[in-house]
Amino acid sequence: MSSITRDILHIIDCAGADPTFTEVFSRLSYATHTEVRETLRRLERNGLIISYYCPSMRQSRYYLSAQVKHLMND
């Protein structure tokens, strides 16, 4: 697992509320906008995270799938 993938999963796991793309991106100073966006899309395609659109934020918010939560708690 790449460091950006691991860091994104950690950010989503530790966030008080489901973080938006902007919140995830702002915490990853070493990654580009494109790297973060592509990694989030790949994680969602693989079923590791779930996103939903938040109209008030005009962005998607992300949370971990049950499968990942189970793996992270072991």
Where is each model-derived feature located?
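A short, conserved structural fragment
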Residues: 44-54
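Short amphipathic alpha-helical interaction segments
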Residues: 30-45
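Short, locally clustered residues in the helix-turn-helix/winged-helix DNA-binding domain
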Residues: 10-16
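Short, cationic-aromatic polyanion-contact patches
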Residues: 54-74
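Short acidic, hydrophobic short linear motifs in intrinsically disordered regions
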Residues: 17-27
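Alpha-helix N-cap/helix-initiation sites
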Residues: 1-2, 17-18, 33, 61
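Short alpha-helical segments that sit at the start of domains
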Residues: 1-10, 58, 73
